[in-house]
Amino acid sequence: TGSSRPFDGEEGKRAAKLYESVFLGYGDDSIAQLGGAHIATEWVSNILTKVLQRGRLAAYLEQSTRYIAYDQEMPGGGYRYFRDENLGPRFSESMDEIFGIYSEALVKVEAWAADKYPRGDEPEGPWKRSIKAKALDLLRGLLPAATLSHVGIFASGQAYEQLLFRMMSSPLPEARQVGGMILEELGKVIPSFVSRVDRPDRGGEWITFLENRRSATEEWVARLGLDRREENPDGPTVDLLNVRGNEEDLLAGCLFESTGVSETAIRSRLEAMSSEERAELMGAMVGERANRRHRPGRGFESVSY
């Protein structure tokens, strides 16, 4: 029936009992990778989207400010920004002013883009959409962190458990509130996988650990005098602090999985190559990329900055 749940009936009960006996009784976290669920979080702040998408082992889809116009009212009225009475009237006034500036600028920037990039032979519909997207992309930097968005998530039970622990231990009230809502919904579809979250002896201890770790970090930040804001510098605001890996690391990483020799032997052979040969090898490892989705191999993970 339409109202039945995945774990209803005898088969569902047996499956739930199996998961719970292994997951709770033996503590084998990996079994929680065997089931997943979709969650849609609507009207969440830009700050919360960062909390939601911090976990590595999940799939996320966020409504992009690059394609959505924020000059329209949301259901119930008002611009699309997070509201809380504890933030006071000055907050709402400031948000309305920012979104008002955005709305006025959107019309002007769209007109500028239409003049800057004339239509030519392109059909009118696609051209108008591209002009709109250009204007939205140029103005998205005006949108504040309180801007609301939607985020879709697909994740395993294990990934959701970690997400809920982070949200429940967060100092952000919105994160704790939405975390409770996510837990309630997951309890309807994958209850065994999130059964530890609200148990004091399991999830409770984990959440307390995360809270204590954050408090300890904040204490050390204060002790080291790092809790004060820096003055805005006149020069560049981005510095290259360090680079991990070099050309040899990258090339060795690319070749390793296709060879039957040690990495030491690979590096020895690379050292004997000329600059021209290395450049040719690098080009071959990159390949003929037709678009941004054609990604080089994992050997490129050997270098980061």
Predicted regions and their residues:
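A conserved ligand/cofactor-binding region detector
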Residues: 1-305
